Amino acid sequence: IGYDSNPAIQQLTDDLVEIAALGQGKGEFMLSVMSKKVMKKQKGDLVIDGKNIELKTSDGGAGRFYDQEVRPNTNWPTLSENYLNTYKEEIDATGLKVPGTGMKIDMISKVAEVMPSEKVEQHKKDLNDIFKAIFPTQDVGSAVEAALAGNVGEAKQRFARLSLDNYLSIKDDDAVLMIDLNTKPISLAIFASAADLYGAGLRLHAGTIYPIATDAR
């Protein structure tokens, strides 16, 4: 209360939100200090007014929905390696070089453009298996379709939404609280699904994405 109208409160909040101390990261410390309704959980982030809240604070790049509990299935690296071997001829035909980090969505779209008709259905199935290994709780069909159709921006957004919804479906959390330290003043958003976020006129940041790779990081 008073953050937007009281310069002193805004300065105090901005200073506290940068502190990581006592086993709490940036944002967690500030919330714990400023509200009695915020408690640190034994495992996970915070309990706010009785709700389990996952806190994501971004002070450089965008927050990632990946941790020790939420990661691709163990068969994902093998599926990725098989894809690179199976479609080596088509990948080479695009003239693109696959870096050590893996294949980006726009590269997948380029490969789809040169895919022989007799391989189209199998290619789609293989991509679906790879995406499903990354997001085991989600229906990945629309993201795969967008990538195959060359709609790279749409595919990235769908991938980002899958990342959030997969994360929330696995974690024991009621919502995610995002704190963006890159804006002045800082901005906050709380949501329980990607639909909530988009419904509020916000969107997920979808930067460089490597669906076909061997390292989840």
Task: Show which residues each predicted segment covers.
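Nucleic-acid endonuclease domains
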Residues: 1-44, 51, 56-217
